[in-house]
Amino acid sequence: FTQDAAYKTAIQPDENNKYPSDCNWTTEAYTNFPNNAQLSSLVTLSGDNGQKLYIVADNTVHSSSDGKLWKKEAEFGDKVQALIASFPNILTVITDNGVYATKDDGVTKETGEFSGTNFPTENIYSTNFESNYQPQVMIVGKSGNDQSEQTVPWVSSNGSYWVPLNNTAYNVYCPKLANPVVMYYGENYYIFGSKEENKLDAIYTSVDGISWRKTQRKFLLDKDMTEITAPYSIVVNAPYIWVIFGGDGSTNAVWRGHLNKLMSAEVQ
């Protein structure tokens, strides 16, 4: 997504179970897409009636069922900072005054809370996992008042109440990254990012979401990727991880990677 148009490409295998080697992108024109849209706030909510897109613009929320036709959702008000949409049918809304969850586009709100400080308010990435057979969501992102040396994941089991996974042990935490991206992939947690803005040069892994280490082998970024200086977004469509660089007016690139153990013999 850009401010001017959306672009799409196939990411599913064809009838021969082959994935596209080249990304053939097509343009989708918008109708009523909001000015000053905060592109990093875009989320996709899965629900009983399919999927729906939401984005924040000037502290208001706008939605679309197809990515092309957009409308303003007045019930959310005009104090929205960010959105999280990882639980089916539940949209978590972060405002100037706190956090709440809604199942009906803001008509009814379940007031939530976060334990501690420095809850993410922008560039939020989320991932789903299970703990004791219960669905959970983990997020990372930027906080306007964060003075911590760590990238701290936050976890929720309902979208309303959030707990930080702080690490007090020496040298086994994920350092503070400029634009961290979290994912649960191949039965491990990963955080991608860099200490520098608009760079992607490190992957950290964890088995519990608390203790982290930098990957040294098997799961690494290509050297050419680490030399790119541009904003990026990352999407997991297992078994693939897609990294999209762009948005700075000069650099546009798409990379795709995977763990070999997750690839079937037919796909490889």
What does each model-identified segment do?
Residues 174-181, 190-201:
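Loop/turn-rich, solvent-exposed surfaces of beta-rich toroidal or solenoidal domains
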